[in-house]
Amino acid sequence: MLMGATRDMGSRCLLHASVPGMLLIWSILQMMNISASCPQCNENASCFNSTHCVCKEGFWTGSENRRIIEPHEKCQDINECLLKELVCKDVSYCRNKIGTYICSCVVKYPLFNWVAGIINIDHPDCYVNKSKNTGSKTHTLGVLSEFKSKEEVAKGATKLLRKVEHHILNENSDIPKKDENPLLDIVYETKRCKTMTLLEAGNNTMKVDCTSGFKEHNSGGETAVAFIAYKSLGNLLNGSFFSNEEGFQEVTLNSHIVSGAIRSEVKPVLSEPVLLTLQNIQPIDSRAEHLCVHWEGSEEGGSWSTKGCSHVYTNNSYTICKCFHLSSFAVLMALPHEEDGVLSALSVITYVGLSLSLLCLFLAAITFLLCRPIQNTSTTLHLQLSICLFLADLLFLTGINRTKPKVLCSIIAGMLHYLYLASFMWMFLEGLHLFLTVSNLKVANYSNSGRFKKRFMYPVGYGLPAFIVAVSAIAGHKNYGTHNHCWLSLHRGFIWSFLGPAAAIILINLVFYFLIIWILRSKLSSLNKEVSTLQDTKVMTFKAIVQLFVLGCSWGIGLFIFIEVGKTVRLIVAYLFTIINVLQGVLIFMVHCLLNRQVRMEYKKWFHRLRKEVESESTEVSHSTTHTKMGLSLNLENFCPTGNLHDPSDSILPSTEVAGVYLSTPRSHMGAEDVNSGTHAYWSRTISD
C-alpha cells in the first residue's frame, strides 16, 4: 500500500511538473517553426523578413543586388573606392576594407596630408557623407599603435620617417626654419649648410661639417640640412626592436628618436662623422652600456643597429654619439646579465677545473711525445687531442673576457672556434681508430693500417675544422665576439657552426663506444678463463667508463639543459656537465698515463734515476765541473729508454690494453691455446696504450 501511494504521488508530481515543461517545449518548437521558414543563409548574409536571405551591408551578389535569389549565389565585398559615386573627398586617401572602407586625410594640417597615405587617419571630414561614424584615433602615433605586430609597426614607422624627412627638406621652401607639428609630435630645424653647422631640436643637437662632409653633393653651393626630433615615437620604436644577440638582460630607449637629413638625390657618404648630443630621458645606470644606434629599415620592417655609429661620452644629462651617415638615431641603455650564485659557482668550477686540466694535458703531451716504447698511432692521436685541448683551454682562461678591442675579441673567438672544433675532430678520430682496431683484432698486418691512417688523420684533424671556420668567417665574420664574451654570437643561429659538427661527432662516438663494448664483450668471453681471471675488474670497468668521457660523449649531457625539465634537474645537469667536461684533461692523463702499466713503469724508472742523480750530486759536490754536468744530464734515453722492461727470466708477452682491458700472461703458464690468445691480444694493444 505504501509503495502504491508513493508511486501515485510521484506520478502526480511528474504530471504537475510536466505542464510548464511542455509549455516551454511547445514555445521553443513554435519559434523553431517560425525561423524555419527562412532558408539557411550563406556567409556574409542574413535572413530578411523571415522569407529570404540578403547580403549584409558592404556586400553584394556581384550584380548590384543584395538579395540572394539562387542558392548558389555568394555575397562579395563591395570595393567602395572604385564606385562611380565618390565616397571620399578629393584630398582623402580611400582604402577598401572587408565590408567597409576608410577615408584617410589630415584635416587640420593639409600640408602634411601625405601622412594619411602611409597610415589610416580616419576622420568624418574626410568623407563625402559626414554622418559616417569612424571612432578611430586621429593622432599619428595612436594609429601606429593599433598595428597588430611588430613587423607592421616597423614598416609603418620606416615609411613615416622617410616621408617626414623628404617633406621637410623638399616641400618646405621656408629655410632656415624652426617649427613643430602636433600631428606628428615632432620639432625640427632646417638650415642652409655650407660650413660647420649646428642644429637643435627638442634639447638635442646635431653638428655636421658641410664643407668636408658633403663635398660631392654641394656642387660648390649651399644645401639644405634638417634635424628632426620625435617626442613620442620612442614609445613604439623602443628597445625591443634592437637585435639583442649580445644577450643583454634589458635594453631600453634612453633618448628621443632624432633624424638627420640632407637635400640630395643620392644617399650622401660622409668623410667626417656627424656629432649627435642627445638628452637622456631617464637617469643612467652605472652598470649599463650605452649604445648609439640608427634605424635600419628593411622589407621585413626594421630594427635598431649599431653599424656606423659609436658611443663617445655619457653623463647624467646627455649622451654624445658620432655616426658616419645620416639616418634616424637614438641611444639605447643596455643592462648586462647579473651573475647569480649558480653562475658564480660554475665559473669557479670552470676556472679551477681548467687549470688542473692544463697541468694534466701538459704532462700527458710530454709523455706521449717523449716515451718511445709507447709511440704508435694511438699515442699520436692522444698527443694531438691533448695539444688542441691544452691550447683551447689556455686561450679560454686568458681571453674569453677580453671584449675590448672588438677586433682582438673577434680573433680570440675565431681561434677558440677552430681549436675546439679541432679537439672534437681528434675525438672523432680517436673513436674511429678504436672502433677499427677492435673490429680487426684478427688482422695481423696492423702496422700498415696504422700508416694508412696517418696519411689522412692530419688533414681531417686540422684541415676540416679550418674549412668550417673559414666558411663561417666569410658568411658572418661579425658574429665572432659579443659584448659579454669572445665567443660565437647567437644571432641568426651562428652558434650552430660549432654546435652542429660537435653534436654530430658526439653522436657518432657514442655509437662507436657501444659497438666497441659489444665487440669486446664477445671477444673476451671467448678467451681462456685463466687469462680473464688475471684482470683487475675494477680498473677495467673504471677505464671503460672514463673512455666515454675521453671521446667527448659527455658533452651530450648539455642537451638536457635546453629541454623542458625541472629547475632542480637542470641545476644538477649544469653542475655535472661543467665538472665532467672541464676535467677532460685530467681524465685523459689518468686513463692513458697513470692507468697504463707500461707508462707507470717508465715513470718509476725515471723517478728512480732522478733520485739516484740527486743523491750522486750531494756526494760529489766537490768534484769537477765536468763531472757535475754529467750528473745533471737527463737525456731522453734516460727518461724513456728503449729496451726490455722486465727481467728475461720472468718475461711476459707485451701487455695489451683494449678500452681499459689488459691482456697479459706469463710464459711459464701458457699453453698453445694461451699463446694464441696472447698473440690475439698483442695485435690489439694500440687501442688505448
UniProtKB/Swiss-Prot annotation:
Residues in the Extracellular compartment per record: 38-350, 401-407, 477-499, 566-570
Positions of disulphide bridges: C38-C47, C41-C53, C55-C75, C81-C94, C88-C103, C105-C126, C292-C321, C309-C323
GO MF annotations, alphabetized: calcium ion binding; G protein-coupled receptor activity
SMART domains reported for this sequence: EGF_CA (SM00179), GPS (SM00303)
Cytoplasmic side: 372-379, 429-455, 521-544, 592-689
Stretches assigned to the EGF-like domain: 38-76, 77-127
Gene3D superfamilies referenced in this protein's UniProt entry, alphabetically: 2.60.220.50, Laminin (2.10.25.10), Rhodopsin 7-helix transmembrane proteins (1.20.1070.10)
Membrane topology recorded in Swiss-Prot or TrEMBL: Multi-pass membrane protein
Similarity section: Belongs to the G-protein coupled receptor 2 family. Adhesion G-protein coupled receptor (ADGR) subfamily.
SUBUNIT field: Forms a heterodimer, consisting of a large extracellular region (alpha subunit) non-covalently linked to a seven-transmembrane moiety (beta subunit).
Known function: May mediate the cellular interaction between myeloid cells and B-cells.
Name of this protein: Adhesion G protein-coupled receptor E4
Gene name of the record: Adgre4
